[in-house]
From Swiss-Prot:
Family: Belongs to the acetolactate synthase small subunit family.
ACT domain residues: 10-84
Annotated coiled-coil segments of the chain: none
The name this protein goes by in its record: Probable acetolactate synthase small subunit
Molecular function GO terms recorded: acetolactate synthase activity; acetolactate synthase regulator activity
InterPro entries assigned to the protein according to its UniProt record, in alphabetical order: Acetalactate_synth_ssu, Acetolactate_synth/TF_NikR_C, Acetolactate_synth_ssu_C, ACT-like_dom_sf, ACT_dom, AHAS_ACT, AHAS_small-like_ACT
Entry keyword Amino-acid biosynthesis: yes
Domain of life: Archaea
Gene Ontology CC annotation, any one: cytosol
């Protein structure tokens, strides 16, 4: 039976940009038995600091535990949950779609246009499409093109920032 109180949480953490930090974060999740749905890491406007965006599924108790444990790690500067309505959350997906005919290519291009995506590569038998947006938008596009034949796919996982003036920044 699925716990109805369980839902997706997006956690943003500022960490020192140095070797081993991601390993310590993922090790924390492994030791605690928490599953990471997606994780993205990239440098911030300060090259000494990286932003880690982690998506976990669980109830509020799990979220609280994850945030407490992350805050205990020495290289973690600050941690915050990014609520869906109070943040901008995006994912990038590259999809290689089977399209051996002009008709199939035209159909893929039309779908891509509707989803405001881009065709980034074209070969005699396939196209590579770039779709950026919410997880739901990307899943809808995948469902639409699946009957055509997805040859290969890569997703980045979610990255996010708080809306408005709220900023996740190190304490001064």
């Amino acid at each position: 039976m699925v716990n109805i109180m369980e839902h997706r949480h997006v956690i943003s953490a500022l960490v020192l940009n140095k070797p081993g930090v991601l390993q310590r974060i993922s090790g924390l999740f492994t030791r605690r038995g928490f599953n990471i749905s997606s994780i993205t890491v990239g440098i911030t406007e300060n090259p000494q600091i990286s932003r880690v965006t982690i998506v976990v599924n669980g109830d509020d108790k799990i979220l609280e535990q994850v945030i407490k444990q992350l805050n205990k790690l020495i290289d973690v500067i600050k941690v915050s949950e990014l609520e869906e309505k109070k943040s901008v959350q995006r994912e990038l997906c590259l999809i290689k779609i089977y399209a051996p005919t002009e008709s199939a290519k035209s159909q893929v291009i039309q779908y891509t246009s509707i989803f405001r995506g881009n065709v980034v590569d074209l070969s005699p038998e396939s196209l590579i499409v770039e779709i950026t947006g919410s997880e739901d938008k990307i899943n809808a596009f995948i469902d639409l093109v699946k009957p055509l034949g997805i040859k290969e796919m890569a997703r980045t996982g979610i990255t996010a920032l708080a809306r408005g003036p709220k900023i996740l920044k190190p304490k001064s």
